[in-house]
Amino acid sequence: MFKRGGIYAVNLAHSETSSQESCPCLVVSNNISNEYSSVVTIIPLSMVNLDRIYDFECFLPAAKSGLGVDAKISSHIIITIDKSSVVGERLGFLNKGLMEQVEKTLRLQLALE
């Protein structure tokens, strides 16, 4: 089962947001939905332009994400995908502190505050 805060490789070949075949993505949908729905909501991770982190982005240090490389999420790219697009096992998992930072960027992007 997919868990909120988990990082998974996702096949985004059919997505308008990516030209690469698979990309590590962070699950942001709630765990009840993740368990019972056929879809999951994700944010793709980027490993480029890490020298500048905007307010709608969140830096994910390798040591705290389990990825082995630094990355960032951009909360303006939120995608709901079919679970069959996920390829392989979980790559990493964000701790509570990092998820709180991600949630802050989501609230900003979605004007929830």
Model-based region annotation:
Residues A63-E113:
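C-terminal terminal-subdomain/extension
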Residues S18-S22, V27-A63:
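Compact nucleic-acid interaction/catalytic patches
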Residues A13-T17:
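Short, charged beta-turn/beta-strand-edge "cap" motif at the junction between a beta-strand
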